[in-house]
């Protein structure tokens, strides 16, 4: 009897993590979700994730309170008093960067995977369109994977399906699974908490919209580019 393949998806209810979840549901026998409540500015994403998780068929969906991150990490995403800016800070990072967020999220997802006996943790981080976040880079992910495997004496792979895709190719991936409309209309990527097309002005909305326009205008080429990356 073959082993049941299990994965834990770090799931925020946004475009990237929803696309990763949909792909995982087509690739694994059991898919579990983990969502984090850290007092984020766009807190509506938690309910969006809960609703989408139920609709798409997660085997289990754990929503964790990690509000201590909000106390420690000062960012436009953790403080309503700080306006989201399209300009970089003096340190070269966006003011939406939450220090340690993916370190914490991947650690907790790794622990959850350990308890479930899952061999994969899936996250939608991306180095191509990473918005300047250092904890979305491939080197960081590989280092985290090594640390978790050594610390728990168990092999668990951190899978990053979007790592080398641009935003247009991420839209193409959703379309490949016949889920472009769902991702476009029902996910929450906007830093100002507006579902679907969002506010249209925050960095997350601008990146999402430019990718969708690129895909809509160059569908065949983007699909071809996606296919070449997926088969490397």
From Swiss-Prot:
* Any matching Pfam family: QueC
Q: State its Enzyme Commission number(s).
A: 6.3.4.20
Per UniProt, Zn(2+) binds at: 190, 199, 202, 205
Q: Its Gene Ontology biological processes?
A: queuosine biosynthetic process
Magnesium among keywords: no
Give the co-factor note. Binds 1 zinc ion per subunit.
Reactions catalysed, as given in the entry: 7-carboxy-7-deazaguanine + NH4(+) + ATP = 7-cyano-7-deazaguanine + ADP + phosphate + H2O + H(+)
Among its keywords, does the record have Glycoprotein? Answer: no
Positions with a binding annotation for ATP:
11-21
Q: Which domain of life is it from?
A: Bacteria
**Pathway where this protein functions:** Purine metabolism; 7-cyano-7-deazaguanine biosynthesis
Q: Which InterPro entries match?
A: QueC, Rossmann-like_a/b/a_fold
User: Which co-factors does it depend on?
Assistant: Zn(2+)
Keywords for the protein's UniProt record, in alphabetical order = ATP-binding, Ligase, Metal-binding, Nucleotide-binding, Queuosine biosynthesis, Zinc
Named from the GO MF annotations, one term is:
zinc ion binding
- NCBIfam families in the record, alphabetically? 7-cyano-7-deazaguanine synthase QueC, PRK11106.1
- Protein family according to the UniProt entry: Belongs to the QueC family.
Biological role: Catalyzes the ATP-dependent conversion of 7-carboxy-7-deazaguanine (CDG) to 7-cyano-7-deazaguanine (preQ(0)).
Write the protein's name: 7-cyano-7-deazaguanine synthase
Q: What lineage is this protein's organism placed in?
A: Bacteria, Pseudomonadati, Pseudomonadota, Gammaproteobacteria, Alteromonadales
Q: Gene encoding this polypeptide?
A: queC
């Amino acid at each position: 009897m073959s082993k049941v393949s299990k994965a834990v998806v770090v799931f925020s209810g946004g475009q990237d993590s929803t696309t990763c979840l949909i792909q995982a549901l087509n690739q694994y026998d059991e898919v579990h979700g983990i969502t984090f409540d850290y007092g984020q500015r766009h807190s509506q994403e938690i309910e969006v994730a809960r609703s989408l998780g139920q609709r798409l068929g997660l085997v289990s969906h754990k929503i964790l309170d990690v509000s201590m991150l909000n106390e420690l990490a000062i960012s436009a995403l953790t403080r309503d008093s700080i306006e989201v800016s399209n300009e970089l800070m003096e340190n070269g990072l966006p003011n939406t960067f939450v220090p340690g967020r993916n370190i914490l999220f991947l650690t907790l997802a790794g622990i959850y995977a350990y308890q479930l006996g899952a061999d994969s943790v899936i996250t939608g981080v991306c180095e191509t369109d990473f918005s300047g976040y250092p904890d979305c880079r491939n080197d960081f992910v590989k280092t985290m994977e090594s640390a978790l495997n050594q610390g728990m004496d168990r092999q668990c792979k951190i899978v990053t399906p979007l790592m080398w895709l641009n935003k247009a190719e991420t839209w193409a991936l959703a379309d490949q699974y016949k889920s472009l409309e769902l991702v476009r209309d029902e996910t929450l990527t906007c830093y100002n908490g507006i579902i679907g097309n969002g506010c249209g002005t925050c960095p997350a909305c601008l990146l999402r919209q430019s990718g969708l326009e690129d895909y809509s205008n160059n569908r065949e080429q983007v699909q071809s580019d996606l296919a070449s990356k997926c088969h490397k």
